[in-house]
Amino acid sequence: MPPIPHVRPENVLRRAEELIAVGQPAAALSVLHEHVTSKRSRSSPIASLEPVMLLFVELCVDLRKGKSAKDGLYQYKNIAQNTNVGTIEMVLKKFIELAEQKVTEAQAKADEIQSSLESAAPTSNVEDLDAIETPETILLATVSGEQSRDRTDRAVVTPWLKFLWETYRTVLEILKNNARLEVMYQATALQAFQFCLKYTRKTEFRRLCELLRNHVQNAAKYSAQMHAINLSDPDTLQRHLDTRFQQLNVAVELELWQEGFRSVEDIHTLLNLSKRQPKNIMMANYYEKLTKIFMVSDNYLFHAAAWNRYYNLLRQSAIALAAGQGSKKDSPSVTEADMTKAASFVLLSALSIPVISTSRSRGALVDVDEVRKNKNTRLTNLLGMPQPPTRASLFKDALNKGLLSRCRPEIRDLYNILEVDFHPLSICKKISPILKEIGADPEMEKYVLPLQQVILTRLFQQLSQVYESVELKFVHELAHFPEPFQVTSSMIEKFIMNGCKKGDLAIRVDHVSGVLTFESDIFSSAKALHPGSAAGSAESEVGSVQRLQSTPAEIARSQLARLAKTLHVTCMYVDPSYNQARIKAKEAAHARARAGAAKEHEETLTRRAIIEKRKEALSDALQKKQREEENRKRARNQQLQEAEQQRLLDEHRERERKRMKDEQDRIRQQELKKQLEELKTGVKGIDVNQIDLEELDSNRLRAIKLAQLEKEKNDLNEKIRITSKRIDHLERAFRREELKHLPEDYETQKKQDLETYEQTKEETLKAARQKHKEDVALKHRLSRLVPYFNDFKKSVTEKRHEEFERRRKAADREFEQKKKQRIKEVHERIRRERAEREAEEQRRREEEERIAREEQERIAKEEERRRALAEEKAAREEQRRKLDEQAIRQRQREEEAEQRRAARKAGLAEPRGPAREASPERTAPRLNLAGRTGTSWRDRQAAKAAASAGEQPAAAQEATPAPPAKAGSYLPPHLRATRDGPSDSRDLSHARESAAPPRQFSRSPVPPSGAPSSQEKPGPWRPRFKQQQ
């Protein structure tokens, strides 16, 4: 059956355009959405579906129907992803461009509204130019001045921003985990990042990052699907890395440090998966963003480590470029100024690392703190360092690479003051000019506060080595910093309390006497009593603090060690053999060490050779395995493609079959429902809900309808009969009873009507009097306004009249213009109709001539056919006549031959006996031998044949007897049968069969020539089928 209307994409597109033209875009969108999401559209060609999708996304954007767009785009992706990926990218790009265009238009509209409000505000509401700033205007500006822009944005721009965000999210969901659409996916993600950055959408940026993270996590889960992305592919992984680096940049720009840190973790995960070495420029950006993240999180140790890694990368890139081993495109541009700046930041960040712990709890004192350990391990892995960094290791690495010679002079002086020549009494005087220079630099200003913490820590550690107690005033004088970095007494006390709380310091503050007392319990195990240990600090190396002298606690703790050293020196002087034995043992140990080193060296060489061989074997095996894996993967992919093609073909066939079946079922159901609705509305008493549509057909429905109509007709007739009978009797009884009460009811009704009339009359008169009084009072009250009303009415009338005249003239002009245009259109239409009529008349004449010409040709062909049939019929008649004549002549010849054969038989059989004449068998010729008495065996056989010949049919007796042959004359061999015996009967039968059609002849004796024949003379010849009838 033909498809229903508007199934083809061209018809749907035409219908949607018609609906848009009449101002019904919602209906057009509904038509397009129904067609796009329909299963029938899967079999439509992509070239015809593409314009439909373009119009569909345009309407979705205009009407802000994000969900409808998502459904349609998902369906279109499933249809086109196996055939044409370019059309999917084009439609999605169009979708994003339209959404971005709407946002731009909304912004322009909001700016226009705001500018109009701002330009209209000073003039429209100002009544006195001398008093512009009235209390009312000030209050209005205070209440709504700053919020008008926000309200305008919320009403105009925000809905389109929300729709644009939904657009990006929808496109990313459609393109996710598809290798053929991967480039478009990455480009859309970058556009979404720019959207978040341009409009400062922090919440949407967090959701976008989480969405991309989920897509990468699900990539491994759906790796078995067709067109799934492969993160092992270097190009794919590089594109994901570029996206994550852009994500990190946007997170830093938006100051979303938590998202930035998660982005760093994502980048680190992808770098671990990558088999290709990442570009230096990317890693430089990576470490640079890490420095910002660690600085915001107050993690100065890993902030300095990130700067160290960044400087190392710049140094290696510069060395590689100088040696010509690297590409300038993949390496960051490095100048001497950049290296100096990076070196200064490396050293300054390392100096800013706190000497003591900066955590707010005492939990950092626990060395086995798993949380801190795990965190440091994660951060170390992010930086790509083999072990967690420390303050001392960072200084050591910086000194080994000569950063002191590269950094700025003030940073070098700061390092010497803090780490080389630290003097607590002159520290602030030396460091003040350096802090001023650092504070003047906006990028280095953030390091001033941690440097103050380091200086205070060094100061109190060295004071605790020299003094047991100091005055607060003395400490304040020592900790004097330049403005605006001045440290107050409260800040110093807060620092002391924080250090004591964490166990890094052991100081008591006496506010009464203004004295700081350092704890000196020699038997205490607190780490604060052992300055320089720095157990809770960022470094673990002992001796980072300059040792001035040993404290009593250290002296008590190292007493046994000092006693052991003294006894050892005494033994060396008292017993010289002890020293000699020690020297010999040392030399023997050195000899064993040299021998072991040589042997270990040989073993190392051997092991290295073995390892190289194993590496080569492993590399060969791995390459072989990779080749086999690639071959298997290629074969598997080919099988999957063939299976997928077969599956798609089967699915297409199944869909077509199912579509045809569903279409037939739908049409049948529609017809049945339509008939049921007609039955429901036309016939009462039928419960349509109880009828099963699956088991219903038109015949049963017709039978149900006829049965119900018959039932209704019978019920109606019965009701009419019963009702008519009841009404007749009841009405007669009512009227008889009513006659008794009619006069009384008439009098009562007349009295009630009179009373009602009087009451209504009185109420009407009273209401009229009251209304008249009120109207008179209103007239006197309003009469004063009549002159003003008349003046106003006159002015309004004049204005209306002028407006009327103006509009009437405009209408007249427009009427004349329309009239001329209408006249022109009518003339054009008449001319066009006349041309069409002439063309139609010409076409009709040509059609009539063509029909007449075809009729003549048909008549001529019919005459020719009849003439040919007549000739053919005459030829057949002539041939049939010739055949009949031939048959008659043949029959005559056969009859003559029969007569001659019969005559010959009759003439030759007379001198023979009856027994010999009746013998049907052929015998040998008689010999002239001596006679004998009795009958021979031939005579007996002839007698038997004669006896049996009487039972044969009489057909053989039809032949006419031939004249007898003369005695002694010659007879041919085929005519000797009747004279010498029946020996030639078979030859005669064979001759008859060859001369005429086969007939049945009798072998009975031929009667004499004078005997009458039992058969009449045969008539004319007839065909055999007529003879058989």
Swiss-Prot record:
According to its UniProt record, where is this protein mainly located?
A: cytoplasm
Against Gene3D superfamilies, the record matches this protein to: 1.25.40.860, UVR domain
The annotated region (Disordered) lies at: 621-666, 797-1029
InterPro entries in UniProt: EIF3A, eIF3a_PCI_TPR-like, PCI_dom
Quaternary structure per UniProt?
A: Component of the eukaryotic translation initiation factor 3 (eIF-3) complex.
Q: Where is the PCI domain?
A: 339-523
Q: What does this protein do?
A: RNA-binding component of the eukaryotic translation initiation factor 3 (eIF-3) complex, which is involved in protein synthesis of a specialized repertoire of mRNAs and, together with other initiation factors, stimulates binding of mRNA and methionyl-tRNAi to the 40S ribosome. The eIF-3 complex specifically targets and initiates translation of a subset of mRNAs involved in cell proliferation.
Give the compositionally biased regions (Basic and acidic residues): 621-632, 644-666, 797-901, 913-924, 977-993
Compositional bias ranges of the Low complexity kind? 943-960
Write out the GO biological process terms.
Answer: formation of cytoplasmic translation initiation complex; translation reinitiation
Question: Which PROSITE patterns does this one have?
Answer: PCI
Question: According to its record, what are the GO cellular component terms?
Answer: eukaryotic 43S preinitiation complex; eukaryotic 48S preinitiation complex; eukaryotic translation initiation factor 3 complex, eIF3e; eukaryotic translation initiation factor 3 complex, eIF3m; multi-eIF complex
The organism's superkingdom is given as: Eukaryota
Q: Does the keyword NADP feature in the UniProt annotation? A: no
Q: What is this protein called?
A: Eukaryotic translation initiation factor 3 subunit A
Signal sequence, start to end: none
Subcellular location(s) per record: Cytoplasm
Oxidoreductase recorded as keyword: no
Family listed: Belongs to the eIF-3 subunit A family.
Question: Where, if anywhere, are coiled coils annotated?
Answer: 92-121, 606-903
Q: Name the UniProt key words of this record, in alphabetical order.
A: Coiled coil, Cytoplasm, Initiation factor, Protein biosynthesis, RNA-binding
The record's section on HAMAP family has: eIF3a
Q: What taxonomic classification does the UniProt entry list for its organism?
A: Eukaryota, Fungi, Dikarya, Ascomycota, Pezizomycotina
